[in-house]
Amino acid sequence: MRLYVVSGSYHPEVGGPSTYLRRLLPELIERGHHVSVITYTDAKNSGIDDGFPYPVYRVSRSWPLILRLVLFTINILWRARDYDVLFVSDYGLPVILANLILRKPIVLKNVSDFAWEYSVRHNWINKRQTIDEFQISRHGWRVRVLQKLRAWYTKKASLIIVPSKYIGKLVSGWGVSPDHVRVVYNALDYSRFDNLPSKADARKTLGYSEKLPIVLTAARLVSWKGVDSVIRTIAKIRDDFPRIHLMVAGDGPERRQLEKLAVESELPVQFLGFRSQENLYNIMRAADVFVLFSTYEGMPHSVLVAMACGTPVVASSIGGTVEVITDQVNGLLVPAGNEKALADAIRQLLNQDSLAQKLSTGAVHTLQRFSWDSLIEKTENSLLEVIN
């Protein structure tokens, strides 16, 4: 199979698509497939990136948006003409336009709702509107155009890969037949967790005492991740745990507002910014509780990482999260936005070592469902399916 991969970002840039493709593509090559990639770069000039054992072409982001999209589309049209299938990871429109001429089978990996995320980022809708509310609410003309565009290019794909049943239902709501949707869960490379330090050693390396209550949240700092609620919640339970320490890993447009909220709450919050995977694993290992209090998750990769690190998880019962966590078995689920329930759950885990241990043990069994072998097998089968 000759596979042409289209992605908005690629290694060494950070982010989900980059990490996913960096691991997936060598595995597909190992299985005898030929791979080529087109993506973007922050460098001034476009061109071939020689740093990979397969062709990677980068289009510069320095061009104005419309011209950038035109160049990206033209390059797909020119470079993908001899390939069997187009595999789109997070960047659908240019490849669909190019394919009006190429007429190739397309597999689209869809992990969210582009129209919703774009509308939130550009303040076209209330930033507190959830992804589910967005699907059924009345919107202005700009949002409606974006929704129609998203539905159009999604329906043009031969097959859509989604990371959870929840996202599958979301996509079906745009007019896509469920027969064209394949659920392929995210995965972890468990070998990366084989040599993790003990909790005590991780804390020693990071400079924290063994008795310090540490709560960690790791997420892109955008409104739907609920980090503001986590800060307020930790401030409320500080009377019970005077030395409690909150760490926030990740960065994003909400960071300045969150830092201001931490100061107003008189809470010592440590904003860590982006961290390497290995460093984040050590931080996860040192934490007593990992919290993900989002109002939306397609498939929470950070929850899988926390589980692999042996850190008990508290998460909001939404989206793909409920496909990973079973309440009181491998984590604690709380209603989205309910800060009182979140506070109670964190208190439980900080006060009950036996519960924390029970959840960590339950998580070990859960992780078996999220293996790379399974992801690669199902992804390869989906790609071959559209050819055959």
PLM segments and residue spans:
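Conserved donor-binding/catalytic core segment of Leloir-type glycosyltransferases
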Residues: V6, S209-K225, I231-I234
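Membrane-proximal helix-turn-helix segments that form the acceptor-binding/catalytic region
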Residues: I74-L77, R81, T130-I160
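Short alpha-helical donor nucleotide-sugar binding micro-motif in glycosyltransferases
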Residues: T154, F274-R275, N282-A287
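Carbohydrate-associated surface elements
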Residues: Y166, A187
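Nucleotide-activated donor-binding/catalytic signature segment of Leloir-type glycosyltransferases, i.e.
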Residues: E259-R275
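Aromatic "clamp/platform" in nucleotide-sugar-dependent glycosyltransferases that forms part
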Residues: T295
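Short hydrophobic beta-strand element within catalytic cores of glycosyltransferases
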Residues: P312-A315, I325
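Conserved acidic donor-binding segment of nucleotide-sugar-dependent glycosyltransferases
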Residues: D327-Q328, L332-E339, Q348-D353
